[in-house]
């Protein structure tokens, strides 16, 4: 009797399909934008600018969701309603989708002949001639997010301490994206943008403080328990 063949590690998984799809769509969009921009077909059109703004907003919301989901997972708060494996899947999905939309957000500007963002100005921090510091906040946030996505596949090779330290970068990425969108977004002064900014920042601050205080409380209990076990 033949034994059933176990799936190999190289087989497709939902996560790899998602990553491949997002990367493919992003690259195709970038190429399409470059083609329209260089041929002059879209000259005078503001479509690229609107697409960039919309996708940037979606990327920010997805990144926020990823950070919140990660905090719910690390603090144990979300385990009351959702099982940890599902929380982790949602966290990874939101992170990957955020990178896809953020890449689209930058690459689509290559087709806008009015703004004129070459590839180097999009992918290299501080290389932009337009607001280099604020643009770099978004670029660094994207690179950090890509690093975190890569860490999902390397988790088995990392220690718990290294994994936690690496994921502190997610907070840096979120707040840099927050500053990038708030400072450069043309809608930042509107009421709805203010509501979104405060509505996304507040949960991250609250859950971050909850995590810090919970960690300190657990550490104090462990230290206190160890002290009581010491012989007199």
Label the predicted regions:
Residues 1-232:
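Membrane-embedded alpha-helical bundles that constitute the cytochrome b-like, heme-associated redox core
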């Amino acid at each position: 009797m033949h034994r059933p063949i176990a799936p190999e590690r190289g087989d497709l998984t939902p996560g790899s399909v998602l990553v491949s799809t997002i990367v493919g769509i992003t690259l195709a969009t970038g190429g399409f934008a470059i083609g329209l921009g260089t041929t002059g077909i879209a000259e005078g059109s503001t479509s690229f600018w609107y697409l960039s703004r919309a996708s940037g907003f979606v990327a920010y919301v997805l990144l926020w969701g990823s950070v919140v989901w990660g905090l719910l997972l690390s603090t144990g708060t979300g385990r009351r309603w959702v099982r940890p494996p599902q929380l982790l899947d949602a966290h990874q999905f939101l992170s990957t989708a955020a990178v896809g939309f953020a890449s689209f957000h930058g690459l689509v500007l290559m087709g806008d002949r009015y703004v004129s963002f070459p590839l180097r100005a999009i992918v290299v921090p501080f290389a932009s001639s337009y607001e280099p510091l604020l643009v770099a906040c978004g670029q660094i946030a994207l690179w950090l997010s890509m690093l975190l996505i890569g860490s999902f596949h390397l988790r088995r090779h990392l220690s718990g301490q290294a994994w936690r330290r690496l994921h502190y970068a997610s907070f840096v990425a979120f707040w840099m994206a927050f500053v990038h969108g708030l400072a450069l977004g043309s809608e930042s002064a509107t009421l709805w943008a203010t509501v979104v900014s405060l509505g996304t920042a507040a949960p991250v601050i609250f859950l971050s403080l909850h995590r810090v205080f919970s960690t300190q409380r657990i550490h104090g209990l462990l230290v206190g328990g160890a002290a009581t076990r010491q012989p007199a």
